[in-house]
């Protein structure tokens, strides 16, 4: 571009020189006419001058365009830089807006929570206000009552709690007379309560300024007297109920009930029948003073219901046939045994019961023969063994007699011997 500008300047300078030279040339000959050769040269020079002028103008225009394009490019670069800076600022603004939106969401959540809490607090405050209003009303009522009491300035509070008594119906059913007595005693208690309540004076100090102390003393004395009377009555009732519960008649009734539960009426009748029949048979078949229980090793099975009854029958038959003159010695021997000997005697009685069933099933003659055969004594050692067994059998008989007497006494509740029998057993 710089070279083009220099060439354009060169072309401009010779043209100006030629123009300066042209007017100087025709000045010497103004009156002469130009020749045709001169005219041709002038036209060519004019064409050349015009072409040079056009080239210079084009070059100048091109230079201007180049300068304008350079300026435009520079402006575009500046605009691009500005656009980049604007984009960065816009991105920052967008980030700030997103942050603001997040903060706005969090603030909206917190505000909603605060609103809920405020609603709850308002509800609680309303409830508290209602409670406070109620309490205020109650306090006002209490204040009014207190003011009334202060105006009266003379009041008493009586606290009474009746003691829990032992009901006699737990032990024994009381007759109608006991209920009548209780009805008669209740109005007395009510009367005493009414008397104590009437003694309380609720008058004011203005009405009775001088007689207050005397009235208080009399009321306290009456209250103490009524309490002492009630305590005495309750203690007497308890003692009476205990006496009635543990009276002789009640104990006998209970013992009779236990006897009926243990041994039924049917079993008693069976025992009596078996006692009468077996007693006659064994008394007729008595052979020697040394009696041994017959057939002690029996294997016959017996029903459970009749085992106890037959045990008593057998133990009753054997000593009845062998009543010895030394009854006092037998009683002392029976009382000297312990509870362990009682258990062994019961076991032997069961064995004897089984043997008795076998003996009764057989004929009376065969029973007598077997008893005679078993009671034959050959040596002195056998005699000593027989004596020991006879003593055991006698003890069993005494125990069976006591049990039979107890059962008979159960049938007759009036007899007082029931307690003595149980004590000895």
Swiss-Prot record:
Q: Which UniProt keywords apply?
A: Acetylation, Coiled coil, Cytoplasm, Lipid-binding, Membrane, Phosphoprotein
Segments for region (Leucine-zipper): 62-100
Phosphoserine-modified residues are: 27, 35, 37, 51, 203-204, 218, 283-284, 287-288, 293, 332, 341, 366, 370, 403
* Protein origin, superkingdom: Eukaryota
Please tell me, according to the UniProt entry, what happens when changing residue 100 to E. Loss of localization in caveolae
* Entry's localization field: Cytoplasm, Cytosol; Membrane, Caveola
Kindly list the biological process annotations in GO that this record carries: plasma membrane tubulation
What is its induction behaviour? Up-regulated in asyncronously growing fibroblasts following serum deprivation but not following contact inhibition. Down-regulated during synchronous cell cycle re-entry.
Phosphothreonine sites (modified residues): 196, 199, 375
What is the species of this protein? Homo sapiens (Human)
Give the protein's biological function: Plays an important role in caveolar biogenesis and morphology. Regulates caveolae morphology by inducing membrane curvature within caveolae. Plays a role in caveola formation in a tissue-specific manner. Required for the formation of caveolae in the lung and fat endothelia but not in the heart endothelia. Negatively regulates the size or stability of CAVIN complexes in the lung endothelial cells. May play a role in targeting PRKCA to caveolae.
The effect annotated for residue 86 to E is: Loss of localization in caveolae
Q: Give the span(s) annotated as Interaction with CAVIN1.
A: 2-168
The entry's free-text remark on domains says: The leucine-zipper domain is essential for its localization in the caveolae.
Assembly and interactions? Answer: Component of the CAVIN complex composed of CAVIN1, CAVIN2, CAVIN3 and CAVIN4. Binds to PRKCA in the presence of phosphatidylserine. Interacts with CAVIN4; this augments the transactivation of NPPA by CAVIN4. Interacts with CAVIN1. Interacts with CAV3.
Gene Ontology cellular-component annotations:
caveola; cytoplasm; cytosol; membrane raft; nucleoplasm; plasma membrane
Which residue ranges does the record annotate as region Disordered? Answer: 1-42, 199-234, 271-425
Q: Which PANTHER family match?
A: CAVEOLAE-ASSOCIATED PROTEIN 2, CAVIN
Compositionally biased, Polar residues: which spans? 274-287
Q: Where is the composition biased (Basic and acidic residues)?
A: 10-22, 220-234, 303-317
Q: What is this protein called?
A: Caveolae-associated protein 2
Record PTM text? Phosphorylated on Ser residues.
- Biased amino acid composition, Acidic residues: 203-219, 376-385
Q: Which family does it belong to?
A: Belongs to the CAVIN family.
